[in-house]
């Protein structure tokens, strides 16, 4: 469960290392986000020479959470960290590589480019 002021690692090579959540998109008064949800965040830590700079406001999709998500068959999938991928307005990633596994729930949100770039889909 990701909410305002949550810090997440960035799982792509866009140049950002860590982001801070500003807002959870999808309805007024929505408090929390889970895997596959889009958030607005600001870059808190970035690598030099990257596409994304520190202080920039970006949109991102959540790909891993510690709290996990429940699947239709009753199983749960949880990860060791909270991570996101920075996206453009057309739901495509800003970077060209994705690091670490991503959840299968991203397919339902039409983030097919992220799923295809990921080394592992759980």
UniProtKB/Swiss-Prot annotation:
A Gene Ontology biological process term: translation
GO CC aspect terms: cytosolic large ribosomal subunit
Signal peptide as annotated in the record: none
Highest taxon, organism lineage: Bacteria
Any Pfam family: Ribosomal_L14
Gene3D superfamilies named in the record: Ribosomal protein L14
GO molecular function: large ribosomal subunit rRNA binding; structural constituent of ribosome
UniProt KW keywords: Ribonucleoprotein, Ribosomal protein, RNA-binding, rRNA-binding
Record InterPro entries: Ribosomal_uL14, Ribosomal_uL14_bac-type, Ribosomal_uL14_CS, Ribosomal_uL14_sf
Family: Belongs to the universal ribosomal protein uL14 family.
Name of the molecule in the record: Large ribosomal subunit protein uL14
Species annotation: Macrococcus caseolyticus (strain JCSC5402) (Macrococcoides caseolyticum)
Name of the gene encoding the protein in the UniProt record: rplN
